[in-house]
């Protein structure tokens, strides 16, 4: 089946060229309200766009062998994660039991005796084990869970259980697009409210500019996310091909709203997601964070309490920007921060919090523990 987002590639470059010329003229005329294009930023966005096209093909081959119930190494992955979790739990217990105040930063502060020496030795071993084992348990569990979820919730797989066939007519097409839009709203919202999913999505928010090239700055690690499955549409009677069409329509719509060249659009702002609404979504201004998650329709945000108008000038990017245009850094910085936080944790509530709770919680927890903040913040 033809991927509409790939067919549109020539149009992407044509419209980016037109936008570049338009914003350049405005800036040369003294209008600093638009940021326009910057070479390294644009190249980074294009590189991430290419990566997002290649990643699904590569990940499918890489992850298939370790998918539980499907790959030869799936069982080994699960056993490794469970074993690492057991080691981590044991190390946590040792660290709690040996926390007697006779060490400061690993340096003895009391005279040695046999019992103290045994405790110190056990504590040193536990410290060496708890980080690597915790990371192995969490990473292995995430890979096992996400690969299993992805393979069991595809549109083609769920289509086998459908009870009706809505066909491919105009009503079915419109229905599929609207249903996809509704599911997209929740998936997009969850990507901002769970740090595990935010680590995937943060790529799209990492630019400090806002133009059509930003729309192409897409994640490459979707394979490690567990989302509300759009395959559910197949259970409702939408054919898998129609579900894919709905995906393409939604993604194409989102392309044109990544621009500063278009102002507010009157009454359309009440129903549709517009450039103005989506500029808010990309803002790091406190009142703009985690707002306007809709794809085509803004009504979901109005209904579920996440709507915000564009009232003041938007500051694009993250609350703490990564200061890098390197694609690898853009793609992995938040994952690296999560694993580092897990490695430095000594209890499961903290580990799970750093992975699954919101990005803001991680900042609060670091502050409570008087630790440095992660490299990149929320958007």
Cite the ranges covered by each PLM segment:
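Cytosolic-facing loops and C-terminal tails of multi-pass membrane proteins
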Residues: 313-379
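Long, highly hydrophobic alpha-helical transmembrane signal-anchor segments
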Residues: 57-68, 135-168
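Membrane-embedded catalytic scaffold of the fatty acid hydroxylase/desaturase
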Residues: 56, 87-88, 92-100, 104, ...
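Membrane-interface helix-loop junction between the first two transmembrane segments
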Residues: 17-43
